[in-house]
């Protein structure tokens, strides 16, 4: 009996065990069904089409230049005026991020200015490279159409497209884990010890740029160690494997001691409370089965689509079908590549050190193997269908069509609504018109970012949209080359406008504001005060989350003698804790 697509792959029985293990990924279909599937050249053309579609989808998302949304702003506000050394300190707005990612983002800002494009450049480049690298890895792990399914899922998955154009470290988490996976797979095929040296040399970069990279590195190291034990690895392989693990441990200790400990000490309690629902209930083990089921049927497996509240149930079913095939055929290497990193992740979550589930961003490091597992599950589903007389050719075409429609739908949505929320779009539109317009007619100063005046202190310590306001201001200052307020130019015809942002959820320090106004009145006459209200709405653009206000205080000289500009250094000291 022939496998219905084994003949489509280039795998030969004389190749390594990794290649031979891909034979079982096919199904048991007859020769007639085998002939009904696309030939090898057609599969290659389809694979190239999906890769190019993935590049196009990511490029469109990046080019559309979505407004920064709140989660991006919380992190990006730290790149406005912090130095590289200051990024080693606790970050503002309860943020934690690996230091090498912070430094690369800061370097991009210094090179290209503070803008949406520069802030998202590193994730975008990482994502494009990942597409081609994943295609290579998938071809090493899977045969024929399974390769196509894996690459297609990876190319059209919403999380992969989204994090290609988002100024957060989750796209680089996936990229670095994929690089490690690629090196392990190449080592297993060729048994070249130098690849283990490459893994060792990668550890300082990977663990310094990605927190979950330690899960991938640790899990893959366990897989390589088990292979060396089972196959009696050479002395050189053992030496290089030990060297890899030594650099892994040293890199983790150094980066944690330098940055991780500082961030954890500052934000550990807040993050633990914020993500407490995403830690497994190890003290209530009777709840664990339901928790695991719901977690994996929700955000953790949101590929190519999915989300909270069981929205990823179909993906979970495909993954379970794939796991069933892996277990039935005793493909322990495959199981190790997937379950090793995820198992360490789960252990960290059980210790309440890193959330498991709750959002797809936390499983980005595992996305390559999840997409491969989904492909195996699709293979199993098509094999089951073929046993009941369904045409393999039609099933294959149906799967490819569905995946293409998913990708096309995502691109269409981005083109129609190039923003995360309408409130984000309105906030950026206001910044673009307000800051440029006022700078032409007046001397303008943002009280917080330009002068370091903080009259609503809580909004700059908590997760508020003040970060959004400050980032949009910094973007417009750089984009339009707006200069700081020059008090020597203030006159009756060119007044001084002082701008204050406030979030209605946080209390205004009225006494401090009145004191500042009294001080300003000694030198200037307050000729107007206007407050522009903005409703901050939820993603559905219906539910009111809070009211935001942009207050403007307009002054003209009282006696014609301008005062000195307040020291700029106060801004960074006030923003940083």
Give residue spans per PLM region.
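Short, intrinsically disordered terminal tails adjacent to the first/last structured region
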Residues: 1-41, 566-577
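Membrane-proximal helix-loop-helix interfaces that form the catalytic/acceptor-binding platform
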Residues: 24-27, 31, 39, 43-386, ...
């Amino acid at each position: 009996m022939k496998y219905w697509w084994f003949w489509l792959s280039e795998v030969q029985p004389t190749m390594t065990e990794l290649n031979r293990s891909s034979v079982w990924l096919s199904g048991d279909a007859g020769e007639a069904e085998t002939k009904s599937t696309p030939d090898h050249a057609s599969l290659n053309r389809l694979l190239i089409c999906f890769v190019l579609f993935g590049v196009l989808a990511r490029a469109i998302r990046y080019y559309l230049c979505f407004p920064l949304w709140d989660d991006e702003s919380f992190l990006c506000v730290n790149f406005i005026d912090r130095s590289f050394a200051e990024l080693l300190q606790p970050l503002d707005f309860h943020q934690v991020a690996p230091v090498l990612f912070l430094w690369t983002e800061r370097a991009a800002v210094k090179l290209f200015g503070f803008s949406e494009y520069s802030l998202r450049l590193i994730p975008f480049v990482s994502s494009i490279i990942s597409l081609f690298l994943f295609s290579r890895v998938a071809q090493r792990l899977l045969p024929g159409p399974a390769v196509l399914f894996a690459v297609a899922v990876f190319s059209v998955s919403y999380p992969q497209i989204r994090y290609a154009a988002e100024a957060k470290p989750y796209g680089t988490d996936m990229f670095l884990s994929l690089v490690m996976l690629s090196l392990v797979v190449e080592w297993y095929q060729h048994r070249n010890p130098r690849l283990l040296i490459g893994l060792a040399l990668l550890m300082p970069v990977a663990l310094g740029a990605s927190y979950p990279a330690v899960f991938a590195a640790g899990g893959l190291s366990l897989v390589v160690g088990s292979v060396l034990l089972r196959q009696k690895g050479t002395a050189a392989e053992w030496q290089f494997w030990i060297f890899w693990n030594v650099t892994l441990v040293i890199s983790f200790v150094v980066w944690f001691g330098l940055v991780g400990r500082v961030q954890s000490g500052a934000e550990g309690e807040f993050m633990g409370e914020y993500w407490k629902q995403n830690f497994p209930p190890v003290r209530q083990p009777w709840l664990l089965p339901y928790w695991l089921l719901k977690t994996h049927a929700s955000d953790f497996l949101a590929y190519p689509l999915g989300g909270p509240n069981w929205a990823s149930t179909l993906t979970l079913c495909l993954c379970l079908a794939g796991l069933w095939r892996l277990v039935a055929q005793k493909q322990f290497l495959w199981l190790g590549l997937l379950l090793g990193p995820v198992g360490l992740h789960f252990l960290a979550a059980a210790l309440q050190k890193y959330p498991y589930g709750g959002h797809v961003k936390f499983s980005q490091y595992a996305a390559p193997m999840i997409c491969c597992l989904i492909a195996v599950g699709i293979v199993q589903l098509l094999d089951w269908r073929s046993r009941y007389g369904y045409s393999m050719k039609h099933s294959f075409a149906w799967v490819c069509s569905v995946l293409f429609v998913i990708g096309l739908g995502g691109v269409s949505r981005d083109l129609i609504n190039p923003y995360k929320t309408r409130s984000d779009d309105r906030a950026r539109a206001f910044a673009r018109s307000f800051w440029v317009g006022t700078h032409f007619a007046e001397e303008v100063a943002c009280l917080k970012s330009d002068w370091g005046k903080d009259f609503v202190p809580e909004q700059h310590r908590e997760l508020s949209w003040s970060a959004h306001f400050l980032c949009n201001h910094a973007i417009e200052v750089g984009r339009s080359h707006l200069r700081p307020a020059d008090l020597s130019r203030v006159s009756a015809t060119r007044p001084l406008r002082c701008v204050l942002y406030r979030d209605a959820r946080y209390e205004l320090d009225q006494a401090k504001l009145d004191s500042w106004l009294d001080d300003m009145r000694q030198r200037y006459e307050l000729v107007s005060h206007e407050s522009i209200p903005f409703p901050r709405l939820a993603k559905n653009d219906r539910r009111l989350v809070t009211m935001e206000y942009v207050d403007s205080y307009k002054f003209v000289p009282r006696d014609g003698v301008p005062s000195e500009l307040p020291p700029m250094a106060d801004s960074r000291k006030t923003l940083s804790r």
